[in-house]
């Protein structure tokens, strides 16, 4: 069984990805930062379905924490050869009044965090000459949105990281891809007004928000052997929003 580490796996898309990967045969390290209870729920869901996993505390912006989390995962489950960089942060606000410290936190969480986790994962992947990396970006990286300059910049950076790294490591049996979800009903989007939510849905040809398992299914494919020729892709899962 291959081993994957999913960041931000205590809830939302991360939990859906962790459970879906476990159901498809991966051992899963449930990466989390704040809530022991959330991580426990994810792990219990994995194990109750017959999967194998472990929970690892992980602050993705802290280099030592990242190194320790991968060490724990390697010792508990085996060499980590799959990584889903899912943990993220978003806070909306117009640029002119946007606090610099929140801008920096957005970039640190969404870009630095993915960089540190990817660098750590590559140490094992390069030795085994096999690996799968999926970065959770956003359709905002393609179309932008007023009030989300920081978030859009960070998610666009993830696409750039994905495409550049795919050229660095593709010949080593490692693929790197990005998934770009549209609007989801998660804690990160709970702040949206009904008017804003209705606007997004109206712009989406399918006419609804995405389901978590729909995004997780794309991640599962990109992590599989069947996706061995998919590399450097940025795949929207947005109901046609960016068509």
Residue ranges and their predicted role:
Residues 118, 154, 162:
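Active-site helix of classical SDR
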Residues 123, 167-168, 228:
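Alpha-helical segment proximal to the catalytic Tyr-Lys
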Residues 205-215:
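A conserved structural motif in NAD(P)-dependent oxidoreductases
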Residues 78, 170, 175, 230-232:
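Short, small/polar-rich loop/turn modules that mediate ligand/substrate recognition or access, typified
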């Amino acid at each position: 069984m291959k081993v994957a580490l999913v960041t931000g796996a205590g809830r939302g898309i991360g939990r859906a990805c962790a459970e879906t990967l476990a159901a498809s045969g991966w051992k899963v390290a449930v990466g989390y930062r704040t809530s022991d209870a959330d991580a426990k729920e994810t792990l219990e869901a994995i194990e109750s379905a017959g999967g194998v996993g472990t929970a690892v505390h992980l602050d993705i912006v802290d280099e030592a924490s990242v190194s320790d989390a991968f060490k724990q995962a390697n010792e508990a489950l085996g060499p980590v050869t799959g990584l889903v960089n899912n943990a993220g942060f978003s806070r909306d606000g117009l640029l002119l009044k946007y606090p610099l410290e929140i801008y920096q936190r957005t970039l640190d969480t969404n870009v630095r965090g993915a960089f540190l986790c990817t660098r750590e994962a590559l140490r094992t992947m390069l030795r085994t000459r096999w690996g799968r990396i999926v970065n959770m970006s956003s359709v905002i990286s393609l179309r932008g949105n007023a009030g989300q300059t920081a978030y859009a910049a960070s998610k666009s950076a993830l696409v750039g990281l994905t495409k550049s790294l795919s050229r660095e490591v593709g010949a080593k049996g490692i693929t790197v891809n990005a998934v770009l979800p549209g609007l989801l009903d998660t804690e990160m989007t709970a702040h949206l007004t009904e008017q804003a939510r209705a606007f997004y849905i109206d712009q989406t040809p399918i006419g609804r928000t995405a389901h978590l398992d729909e995004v997780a299914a794309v991640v599962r494919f990109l992590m599989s052997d069947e996706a061995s020729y998919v590399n450097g892709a940025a795949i929207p899962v947005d109901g046609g929003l960016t068509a």
